[in-house]
Regions:
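Short, basic phosphate-binding NTP loop
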Residues: 1-26, 33-46, 170, 175
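Conserved helix/coil segment N-terminal to the catalytic DExD/H
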Residues: 98-106
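Acidic, Mg2+-coordinating active-site environments of NTP-dependent enzymes
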Residues: 19, 86-87, 101, 110-176
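Flexible beta-alpha connector loops of hexameric P-loop NTPases
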Residues: 64-72, 121-126
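Residue-level signal for inorganic ion chemistry
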Residues: 10, 25, 52, 77, ...
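Switch II (G3) loop of P-loop NTPases
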Residues: 89-98
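Short beta-strand-centered segment that lines the nucleotide-binding/catalytic pocket of NTP-utilizing
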Residues: 46-59
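Conserved alpha-helical scaffold flanking the Walker A/P-loop in AAA+ ATPase domains
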Residues: 76-83
C-alpha cells in the first residue's frame, strides 16, 4: 500500500491531473443514471468525455473496458482520466462509499461533486448509517477542490449536517 501511494505521488508530480473538469457523483441510488445523463448531454454538445462507473470505462460514450468495481483503484482512475491528453474535456465518475472510504479518489481533482440520495446500504462494510454517511461526505470535505461546486439533494437524510460541512468549506452550493 505504501508503494502504491509512492507510485501515485510520482505520477502526480510528473503528470498533474489532466482533464479540464472533473465531476464525481455519489449517493445510494442514481449514480449510474446521473453519470450517463451527463455523458449524453456532453455528447450532444460536442464535449469530449471519459466516464467510469458500474458499467465500465467509456470514452465519448464508447466502452473501452469493463470494471469490477463502481469506483476502480486510485491508480486506475488516475491513469484513465489522464489517458489521451487531446480531447480530454470532462472526466465523469461514480464515487462509491467504499471507494471514498478507501481513498481511491486521492490524487484526483474533482471540480463538481454531487450526491443524489442517502439511505441505509452497505452496512456490512460501514457498520452504521453514520459511518456510511461520513464516507459519502468525504467527497465534499476531502476530495472536492476548494473552488469546487457541491450539488446536494435537499431531501437528503442528514441534509442539514451535509450542508453545514459544505458551508464550512465556503464551496459553491447548488441544491435541488
Amino acid at each position: 500500500n505504501d508503494l502504491h501511494k509512492e507510485i501515485l505521488n510520482l505520477l502526480n508530480f510528473r503528470q498533474p491531473f489532466n482533464p479540464k473538469k472533473s465531476i464525481a457523483i455519489t449517493g445510494t441510488n442514481g449514480k449510474t443514471s446521473t453519470t450517463w445523463y451527463l455523458a449524453q448531454i456532453c455528447k450532444y454538445n460536442n464535449i469530449q468525455t471519459k466516464l467510469t462507473g458500474t458499467l465500465g470505462f467509456y470514452k465519448n460514450n464508447k466502452k473501452v473496458k469493463n470494471s469490477s468495481l463502481t469506483t476502480p483503484s486510485n491508480l486506475e482512475l488516475y491513469q484513465f482520466a489522464n489517458s489521451n491528453k487531446r480531447n480530454n474535456d470532462l472526466f465523469i465518475s461514480e464515487a462509491s462509499s467504499h471507494g471514498l472510504d478507501q481513498g481511491r479518489y486521492n490524487y484526483l481533482r474533482v471540480d463538481i461533486a454531487a450526491i443524489t440520495n442517502l439511505s441505509h446500504d452497505h452496512l456490512d462494510y460501514h457498520r452504521t448509517f453514520k459511518s456510511y454517511a461520513e464516507s459519502k461526505l468525504l467527497l465534499f470535505t476531502k476530495v472536492l477542490n476548494k473552488n469546487g461546486v457541491a450539488v446536494i439533494n435537499s431531501r437528503l437524510k442528514n441534509y442539514k449536517y451535509f450542508l453545514s460541512k459544505i458551508k464550512s468549506r465556503n464551496l459553491k452550493l447548488i441544491t435541488f
